[in-house]
């Protein structure tokens, strides 16, 4: 018997990506507070957050298979969250301008008796950005709900010179790796 699949996320991007798999699922947003532990590496932090999100939803739905995910943008060993305002978005984009950074997405798939968590890292390189480029992009309001203040799947694609890794991981869910992991939980497309 196939268990009910739940995506523990309110991210519209993760929903779109999970829809690519053409498997039935429901959405229950996790209400966990996203706090980073300064004693952990970025990879460990993003994995912990993904596990916490999945675990919180699983606690209320013990007969389900739950997917939790989290994405971080890191540069110079520092993780950039979602900007709180336009000034913080501009600061983040200036830091990323003309440089490479890492986008780390962790996925945790959990049932009452099993947990699989994995991380996927993609290197993204930005074009050098002028102050006008930055301000025009901020005007779109696209940076405001995204880690690192950009969305590669939208107008933020114009900022990106190249990527080395999984495009879908940068968007928020490494689709192929997630599907392979779901097969281990007897969920198939």
From Swiss-Prot:
Top class in the EC scheme: hydrolase
Reaction equations catalysed: dTTP + H2O = dTMP + diphosphate + H(+); UTP + H2O = UMP + diphosphate + H(+)
Entry EC number(s): 3.6.1.9
Cofactor: a divalent metal cation
Assigned keywords, A-Z: Cytoplasm, Hydrolase, Nucleotide metabolism
Active site: 70
Stored InterPro entries: ITPase-like_fam, Maf-like
Function: Nucleoside triphosphate pyrophosphatase that hydrolyzes dTTP and UTP. May have a dual role in cell division arrest and in preventing the incorporation of modified nucleotides into cellular nucleic acids.
Protein name: dTTP/UTP pyrophosphatase
Organism: Bacillus velezensis (strain DSM 23117 / BGSC 10A6 / LMG 26770 / FZB42) (Bacillus amyloliquefaciens subsp. plantarum)
């Amino acid at each position: 018997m196939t268990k009910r699949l739940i995506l523990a996320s309110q991210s519209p991007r993760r929903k779109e990506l999970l829809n690519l798999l053409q498997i039935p699922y429901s959405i229950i947003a996790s209400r966990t507070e996203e706090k980073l532990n300064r004693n952990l590496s970025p990879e460990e932090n993003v994995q912990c957050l993904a596990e916490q999100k999945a675990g919180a939803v699983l606690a209320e739905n013990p007969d389900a298979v739950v997917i939790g995910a989290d994405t971080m943008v890191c540069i110079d060993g520092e993780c950039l969250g979602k900007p709180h305002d336009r000034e913080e978005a501009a600061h983040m984009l200036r830091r990323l301008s003309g440089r490479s950074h890492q986008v780390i997405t962790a996925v945790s798939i959990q049932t009452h008796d099993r947990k699989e968590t994995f991380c996927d890292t993609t290197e993204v390189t930005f074009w050098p950005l002028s102050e006008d480029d930055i301000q025009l992009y901020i005007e779109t309001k696209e940076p405001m709900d995204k880690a690192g203040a950009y969305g590669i799947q939208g107008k933020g694609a114009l900022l990106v010179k190249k990527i080395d890794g999984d495009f879908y991981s940068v968007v928020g869910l490494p689709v192929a790796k997630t599907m392979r992991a779901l097969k281990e939980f007897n969920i198939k497309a």
